[in-house]
């Protein structure tokens, strides 16, 4: 039985407990809002917001539970279309129905893992409960939620599988290198260096930072990510114990049929192997609302994050306020704005040149800038189609 400790306040770095025994990574909830398919949390009375957040919590759990039904419908549709072909054409592909049966088995396995994840998340927040499911039965989930869930399965590849190592090396290593350079152990006590990772996803970057002894807190807004990161960080200790089939949803651009049904194994490391006395926690909620206390953080590390903003200047403003004087902001990522072209959504799409100008006008001092850091994001390494990003890496400092 792991010893539980109290999570830090959502707006402050955790304080070192001094205990050396293994502890759970604590998840504390700020305000997550209703999380409509696109857009910021809905504003209203406190009671309305609590109700909407509770409904969204159970809506995401329902999506995890509905996955198998949705995917079996997809496979059945493919089989019906195949059966509509002339007999002579079907006879050319005797292995095709067998391949679909293999996909069905992969779907069933994924569903088992997803049920395990959500069965463990009902009481995952140390400071919040969401009551009972009002529906009490599995309901059809939206296409939006199913797409989110499929994307979350690919996050396991990126963050916690051996398959994702090359992608992590491209995205996370440059950030970690800058942290080590700016806070060397010869001059800093790492446990006193407070580092925040907004948009933490499944938590691997924040975990790697905590592995180096720094006090690190990850922040994430998506319940899809939070449920999954809680499972990996707190319920997985045996290396490569679990497997998933993240590519079965991809029916195009497969060189071989076997590529579609190949598994990945996770976690590739023991998430419980943090050094004794490690100071690592996760918070759930809107980055801009949770983190309001000025001059709190020594370092803020953002990876594939700033383009998730409705207005990236709001992110810059928050980072400026919560960084300590002398603190640094490390950013790596592209500018694929998440709310671009969505109806009824504010979306300010700035070029990197504009963002840089705003950052400098706030008073940040530019120390590192690399404009062509090549990276992928949840890439299927055997796919016939891959997207590559030429990311920007910059390090800026808030003056003393």
UniProtKB/Swiss-Prot annotation:
Optimum temperature is 50 degrees Celsius. S-adenosyl-L-methionine binds at residues 155, 158, 199, 220, 286-287, 303, 315. The keyword Methyltransferase applies. It is found in: Cytoplasm, Cytosol; Nucleus. Its EC number is 2.1.1.22. Pfam families: CARME. GO terms for cellular component: cytosol; nucleus. It is an enzyme of class 2 (transferase). GO terms for molecular function: carnosine N-methyltransferase activity; protein homodimerization activity; S-adenosylmethionine-dependent methyltransferase activity. N-methyltransferase that catalyzes the formation of anserine (beta-alanyl-N(Pi)-methyl-L-histidine) from carnosine. Anserine, a methylated derivative of carnosine (beta-alanyl-L-histidine), is an abundant constituent of vertebrate skeletal muscles. Also methylates other L-histidine-containing di- and tripeptides such as Gly-Gly-His, Gly-His and homocarnosine (GABA-His). This is Carnosine N-methyltransferase. It comes from Rattus norvegicus (Rat). The lineage of its organism: Eukaryota, Metazoa, Chordata, Craniata, Vertebrata. The gene is Carnmt1.
């Amino acid at each position: 039985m792991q010893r539980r400790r109290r999570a830090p306040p959502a707006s402050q770095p955790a304080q070192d407990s001094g205990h050396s025994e293994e502890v759970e990574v604590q998840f504390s909830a700020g305000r997550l809002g209703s999380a409509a398919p696109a857009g910021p949390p809905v504003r209203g009375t406190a009671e309305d917001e609590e109700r909407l957040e509770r409904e969204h919590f159970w809506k995401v759990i329902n999506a995890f539970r509905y996955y198998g039904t949705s995917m079996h419908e997809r496979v059945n549709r493919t089989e019906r279309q195949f059966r509509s072909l002339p007999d002579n054409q079907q006879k050319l592909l005797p292995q095709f129905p067998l391949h679909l049966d293999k996909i069905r088995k992969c779907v069933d396995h994924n569903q088992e893992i997803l049920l395990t994840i959500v069965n463990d998340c009902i009481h995952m927040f140390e400071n919040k409960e969401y009551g009972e499911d009002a529906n009490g039965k599995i309901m059809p989930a939206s296409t939006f939620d199913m797409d989110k869930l499929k994307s979350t399965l690919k996050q396991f590849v990126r963050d916690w599988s051996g398959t994702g190592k090359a992608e992590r090396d491209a995205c996370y290593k440059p950030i970690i290198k800058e942290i080590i350079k700016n806070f060397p152990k010869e001059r800093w006590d790492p446990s006193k260096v407070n580092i925040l990772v907004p948009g933490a996803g499944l938590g691997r970057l924040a975990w790697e930072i905590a592995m180096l002894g720094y006090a690190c807190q990850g922040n994430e807004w998506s319940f899809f990510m939070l449920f999954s990161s809680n499972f990996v960080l707190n319920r997985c200790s045996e290396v490569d114990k679990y497997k998933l089939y993240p590519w079965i949803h991809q029916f195009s651009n497969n060189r071989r049929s076997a590529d579609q049904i190949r598994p990945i194994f996770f976690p590739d490391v023991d998430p419980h192997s943090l050094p004794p006395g490690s100071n690592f926690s996760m918070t759930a909620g809107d980055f801009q609302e949770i983190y309001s206390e000025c001059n709190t953080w020594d370092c803020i590390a953002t990876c594939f994050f700033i383009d998730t903003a409705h207005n990236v200047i709001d992110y810059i403003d928050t980072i400026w306020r919560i960084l300590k004087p002398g603190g640094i902001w490390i950013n790596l990522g592209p500018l694929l704005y998440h709310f671009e072209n969505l109806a009824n959504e504010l979306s300010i799409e700035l070029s990197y040149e504009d963002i840089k100008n705003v950052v400098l006008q706030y008073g940040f001092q530019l120390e590192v800038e690399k404009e062509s850091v090549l990276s992928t994001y949840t890439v299927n390494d055997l796919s016939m189609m891959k997207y590559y990003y030429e990311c920007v890496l910059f390090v800026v400092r808030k003056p003393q």
